[in-house]
């Protein structure tokens, strides 16, 4: 009976991952360990409605994420958004994942501070907390101010201790992360100029990029 009542703790970290880099991976690992998640899924976006079109194909981005997390305990890849032929709205993904979990399982949506501050522009954003808790990755250099809608939401739903969030969904909390000044834009620019991205991406990802000649100026 005890196994039937066990609560699973699942996190999701979405992104274009164009390409996936050590900043994404370090954040994912730190959250998974700090929150003692059973699983943290990296979820590549197919056609993110709030971002520019990715530079390389969904198949390449998915392959790089899979290579990046291969053999890393607690991290996995969820490719459901790549199967859609329409913009990948987060609310649709949350509804889909929640339908696969038990009603008492905890689902955590992991967002960077800038993405969190932009939530009011997201499709059906007011419904997100019906399906998940939100974990905001906080950095000491964050300088974007949240809009009033989020200030009100934080006042009503924030939990000071992220590990104390109870129930399957409904709360917001903050997790401090190691600040790594790495961006996918920076990596693409390096590669386009013929420079190396070594130590900014995992070796397996760099090998994939080189084998498929991705992000070169001609691309």
Swiss-Prot record:
Function: Catalyzes the reversible adenylation of nicotinate mononucleotide (NaMN) to nicotinic acid adenine dinucleotide (NaAD).
Broad EC category: transferase
PANTHER family hit by this protein: NICOTINATE-NUCLEOTIDE ADENYLYLTRANSFERASE-RELATED, PHOSPHOPANTETHEINE ADENYLYLTRANSFERASE
Family under the similarity heading: Belongs to the NadD family.
Keyword terms: ATP-binding, NAD, Nucleotide-binding, Nucleotidyltransferase, Pyridine nucleotide biosynthesis, Transferase
Disulfide bond positions: none
CDD domains on file: NMNAT
Protein name listed in UniProt: Probable nicotinate-nucleotide adenylyltransferase
GO biological process: NAD biosynthetic process
SUPFAM superfamilies xref list: Nucleotidylyl transferase
Gene: nadD
Source organism phylogeny: Bacteria, Pseudomonadati, Pseudomonadota, Gammaproteobacteria, Pseudomonadales
The species this protein was found in: Pseudomonas entomophila (strain L48)
Reactions performed catalytically: nicotinate beta-D-ribonucleotide + ATP + H(+) = deamido-NAD(+) + diphosphate
Molecular-function GO term, any one: nicotinate-nucleotide adenylyltransferase activity
EC number(s) per entry: 2.7.7.18
